[in-house]
Regions:
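The short loop immediately C-terminal to the conserved phospho-acceptor aspartate in CheY-like receiver
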Residues: 12, 55-56, 82, 86
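The feature encodes the CheY-like receiver
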Residues: 16, 58, 76, 88, ...
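Charged docking surfaces used in two-component/phosphorelay signaling
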Residues: 17-25
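Short hydrophobic/Thr-rich beta-strand motif most characteristic of the beta2 strand and flanking loop
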Residues: 27-36, 42
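Active-site beta3 strand of CheY-like receiver
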Residues: 46-52, 57
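C-terminal output helix
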Residues: 108-117
Length: 117
């Protein structure tokens, strides 16, 4: 049984809810944040195994959060998958350059995401 914790960071409740349900069915433990401030606090407090991160968030971008995480020793090795509506090739390259381990565009298939995790 997989009990790894996944932090879902998205400002849209419906996306977080859909991801949480799909991941819990695959035996992941999920925690959620709707902005980068909440996300950073959960990362520090809960130490999730992986981060699913939207690009466009209130209070700052997912890229800003990822850049901060990759600079800090405590969090630099945390795997990050960007989940975003930004589909342009330049956006994909920018997300990967900042430190994303994978980049998935919305809409996406939950089963494919779980396979990538």
């Amino acid at each position: 049984m997989n009990t790894q914790t996944v932090l879902i960071v998205d400002d849209e409740f419906a996306i977080r809810d859909m991801l949480r349900m799909a991941l819990e069915m695959a035996n992941f433990h999920c925690i959620e944040a709707e902005n980068i401030q909440q996300a950073y606090q959960l990362i520090v407090d809960e130490r999730p195994a992986i981060l699913l991160l939207d690009w466009m968030l209130p209070g700052g971008s997912g890229l800003e959060l990822m850049h901060r995480l990759k600079r800090e020793e405590l969090t630099r090795d945390m795997p990050v998958i960007m989940l975003t509506a930004k589909t342009a090739e330049d956006n994909v390259i920018q997300g990967l350059d900042v430190g994303a381990d994978d980049y998935i565009t919305k809409p996406f298939a939950p089963r494919a995401l779980i396979a990538r995790i």
